Amino acid sequence: MNFSNAIEIKGLTKRYGPVVALDRIRLEVRRGELFGLIGPDGAGKTTLFRLLTTLIDPDEGQASVNGMDTATEYRNIRKTIGYMPGRFSLYPDLTVDENLAFFAALFGTNLRDSHDLIDPIYRQIKPFRTRRAGKLSGGMKQKLALCCALIHRPSVLFLDEPTTGVDAVSRSEFWDMLAELKAKGISILVSTPYMDEANRCDRIALINEGKVLGIDTPQGIVSGFNAPLFALHGDNMFGLLKAARCYAGVLTCYPFGQTHHLVTESGFNAVRFIETLSAEGFSAIELYPVEAGIEDVFIQRMENESGQSHIG
């Protein structure tokens, strides 16, 4: 066991009947690290959080938090971690202050003991302190839930898709708050389906269908993209998608914002490709090289894993 790690996961597997929710997961989160689990809904992120927060047991493998085994030392683990589930787990009929007092009582503490830790966050919701939690906006619920998760001064924080369902401004503010908590020495494991949030993490793990597809810094993940990448746009986007996927030299093509991203073999002849599309009746065609991002890498590795593409 490496005590420089806040979390260690060795071969965790969890099944629900015939469904393998987690398949031999292995990763470590270092102390003081902001680590992101990046993947779509159904990837296994929530199951992993429930295992690490000792709510369920694995079928195979081991995990430790703060050097304590999740299977045998779960009571001690629960005293040292904060957990913010995806639905925030607030009591909607209690006010902001009543929710905080309730969670403080659960851990045998009070607001004064954690004032310095939660006050920068609490100040943003203090004007609504007498409002019932069920009447708060998504962003305010998010901040209240984070305060509740921090009320007992945990050393490790688990955040399961904390920015889902909140506006873009609240999302950005939340990541700023996480950076401040990291600076105070708290180790953070956060999951998100938003690929753009990956860049706010020290390291990330790409996860899909219960398997880890890669672990590295965001920059390291992107540098592993190993094929030419183009953006494609035209007057018939659906038709272009089908035509591009059938073209020799195109490894894969997928919608990406207002364009399609086109992954090709090396030596791909872009001029000939445009000429072919024009001859097939497409017009206003734009094709230009772009740099890969986290989402491109995720799609590439997901297709490699499933065998749907011969990229790389």
Per-region residue spans from a language model:
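ABC transporter nucleotide-binding domain
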Residues: D176-E265
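C-terminal coupling/interaction segments
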Residues: T264-G312
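Conserved protein kinase catalytic domain
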Residues: R78, V222, F298-I299
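Short phosphate-engaging motifs
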Residues: A21, E197, G239-L240, N269, ...
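ABC transporter nucleotide-binding domains
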Residues: I7, K14-I207, G214
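ABC-family P-loop ATPase nucleotide-binding domain
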Residues: M1-T13, N304-G312
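Short, surface-exposed acidic/glycine-rich loop or hinge patches that mediate macromolecular interfaces
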Residues: M68-A71, V212, D235, G267-F268, ...
